[in-house]
């Protein structure tokens, strides 16, 4: 049997797009005849604390859905402090080194990047002539950090760029979740083999029914990470609520700020539903009219996986993130676009949308696009041929 190792920083029972994406890849490879092993830290995201059932462990191994999962020790932290975040990544990197020394590593390895330091550890220490290293790039780091204002172009930034370029050079195959990511990598390493691997979901498509609502207001929903990059707190402050009510699901750095804002502004139609499981969320999402996908700043290379997830649910989107995601929404008629960072334009776009736009026919049409254009299994089979 073909053996393959996946090294990641996020994996269930952690929640979020990153954990779901890697779990889906692992399950897909297993179903296609691979013996899959996953290495991941002890679960701690998004709280920054090791989950209750894993506390006190240094290394915990389990077998789930025919996949072997090694969960390694990490200094868990979700602090904004850069030194604490660095310490977390260093601790996981040392745990990986310990694993590489004492355990046999297969000849096919998929490494998730970012985090850059974890990817560097893998690309440096696992580099062998007979081993195929596949680098799965979901964000262009440190460039994305520069766009978000996390980094300045200084000595530390140049070190991160060096690590980024090193990782690309050592990869036998690079997966990128967007055309922009692949273009950036090809500009740095033109001889590298690349493959466009979108974050397509793989769940049963729900059957949609006509909904009748007395409320004239549009039910707008956001579901996901409540982080700095998404800017949902600012969204709560800037939205014009004349024609909408705003529902929020998720957790992250901005959670408390959002809860406090709702508490201090009880007249605004903002409802925070907390963090829920993906299985619970999907049936809830199809009850809404429109989902918003925001990015506080345009991040080169970023295409939020929600875009593909919502299309499978038949849920129209209001895309507020710029870049390649805009082009996908336009090309496949998945919803509406507002200029990234321009809240006046966002409110103008919202004011021009009415309840009559959310017909069953339109929602089914969006699902059909997902079926024909965003198919996980079709993409996976093409990827397997590259292995």
Q: What do the PLM-derived regions correspond to, one by one?
A:
Residues 1-65, 202, 237-240:
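N-terminal subdomain of nucleotide-sugar transferases
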Residues 94-97, 117-120, 124-128, 154-174:
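Membrane-proximal helix-turn-helix segments that form the acceptor-binding/catalytic region
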Residues 180, 197-200:
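Carbohydrate-associated surface elements
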Residues 213-230, 236-247:
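Conserved donor-binding/catalytic core segment of Leloir-type glycosyltransferases
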Residues 217, 245-250, 256-282:
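Nucleotide-activated donor-binding/catalytic signature segment of Leloir-type glycosyltransferases, i.e.
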């Amino acid at each position: 049997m073909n053996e393959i190792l996946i090294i990641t920083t996020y994996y269930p029972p952690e929640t979020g797009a990153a954990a779901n994406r890697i779990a889906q890849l692992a399950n897909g490879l297993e179903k296609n005849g691979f013996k899959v092993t996953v290495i991941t830290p002890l679960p701690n995201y998004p709280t920054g604390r090791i989950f209750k059932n894993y506390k006190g462990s240094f290394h915990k191994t389990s077998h789930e859905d025919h996949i072997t999962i090694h969960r390694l020790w990490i200094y868990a932290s979700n602090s904004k402090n850069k030194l604490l975040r660095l310490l977390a990544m260093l601790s996981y990197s040392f745990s990986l080194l310990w694993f590489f020394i004492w355990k046999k590593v297969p000849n096919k390895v998929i490494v998730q990047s970012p985090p850059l330091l974890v990817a560097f550890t893998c690309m440096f220490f696992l580099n062998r002539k007979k081993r195929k290293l596949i680098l799965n790039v979901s964000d262009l780091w440190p460039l994305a950090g520069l766009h978000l204002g996390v980094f300045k172009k200084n000595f530390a930034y140049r070190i991160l760029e060096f690590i980024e370029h090193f990782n690309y050079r050592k990869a036998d195959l690079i997966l990128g979740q967007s055309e922009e990511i692949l273009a950036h990598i090809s500009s740095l390493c033109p001889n590298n083999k690349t493959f466009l691997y979108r974050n397509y979901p793989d769940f049963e498509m729900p059957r949609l029914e006509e909904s009748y609502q007395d409320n004239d207001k549009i039910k707008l929903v956001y579901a996901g990470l409540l982080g700095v990059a998404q800017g949902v707190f600012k969204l709560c402050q800037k939205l014009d609520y004349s024609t909408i009510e705003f529902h929020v699901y998720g957790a992250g750095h901005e959670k408390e700020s959002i809860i406090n804002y709702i508490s201090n502004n009880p007249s605004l139609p903002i409802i925070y539903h907390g963090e829920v499981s993906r299985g619970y969320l999907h049936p809830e999402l199809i009850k809404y009219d429109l989902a918003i996908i925001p990015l506080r700043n345009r991040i080169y290379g970023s295409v939020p996986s929600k875009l593909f997830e919502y299309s499978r649910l038949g849920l129209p989107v209001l895309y507020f993130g710029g870049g390649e995601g805009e082009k996908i929404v336009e090309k496949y008629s998945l919803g509406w676009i507002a200029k990234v960072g321009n809240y006046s334009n966002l409110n103008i776009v919202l004011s021009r949308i009415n309840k009559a736009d959310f017909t069953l026919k339109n929602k089914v049409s969006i699902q059909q696009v997902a079926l024909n254009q965003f198919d996980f299994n079709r993409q996976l089979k093409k990827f397997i041929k590259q292995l």
